[in-house]
């Protein structure tokens, strides 16, 4: 997004208008980044788009139950276990209405996090326990 910086001081030599590129973001809107270890953060639309661009060729999406929330992750990092597939790491969660992705807002961050956490399973390897997202 560009903004216009106008400086007028009744000085015909130095008065000017300059286009400046800025990144404005809404505090109440964004995408949720959440990891299987419980850590999370909210990213703005610009960072969400950068992540989605990087996931373009390697991404895998999973709906979070019957909700409109979809978790997108690096599909190359999905692992097979005896009973199915799972993912360990972080995902980006946005809404999908069947046509387009959109940002989360308000209490949707908590709802999306709860949906994500409800799909975590505990795996054990060499005596070490860790959480993983169970995939359908």
Regions found by a protein language model. Name each.
Residues 1-136:
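Short beta-rich binding modules
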């Amino acid at each position: 997004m560009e903004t216009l910086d106008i400086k007028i001081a009744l000085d015909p030599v130095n008065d000017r208008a300059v286009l400046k590129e800025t990144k404005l973001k809404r505090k109440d809107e964004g995408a949720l980044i959440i990891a299987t270890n419980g850590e999370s953060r909210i990213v703005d639309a610009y960072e969400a788009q950068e992540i989605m661009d990087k996931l373009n060729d390697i991404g895998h999406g999973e709906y979070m139950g019957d909700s409109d929330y979809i978790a997108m992750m690096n599909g190359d990092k999905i692992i097979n276990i005896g009973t199915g597939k799972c993912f360990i790491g972080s995902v980006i969660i946005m809404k999908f209405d069947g046509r387009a992705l959109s940002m989360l807002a308000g209490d949707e961050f908590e709802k999306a996090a709860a949906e994500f956490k409800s799909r975590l399973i505990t795996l054990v390897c060499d005596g070490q326990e860790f959480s993983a997202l169970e995939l359908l």
